[in-house]
């Protein structure tokens, strides 16, 4: 039972990391308030700027 729980937890963490992958187009744009717009143009739900990098949400 513990093994199944650990496997599910690891898969959840990996999927969360993949869902918020950085967007290189927004990074090149400087990520100054236009991150959400760029992510929406790419068909993503939205985005957030963190440490100068834009992260798009699926």
Curated annotation (Swiss-Prot):
The record marks 57 as: Aromatic residue of the functional dyad. One of its GO terms (molecular function) is toxin activity. It is found in: Secreted. Residues 1-19 form the signal peptide. Expressed by the venom gland. The keyword Manganese does not apply. Keywords: Disulfide bond, Ion channel impairing toxin, Neurotoxin, Potassium channel impairing toxin, Secreted, Signal, Toxin. GO terms for cellular component: extracellular region. Disulfide bonds join 31-49, 35-54, 39-56. Belongs to the short scorpion toxin superfamily. Potassium channel inhibitor family. Alpha-KTx 26 subfamily. Inhibits voltage-gated potassium channels. This is Potassium channel toxin alpha-KTx 26.2.
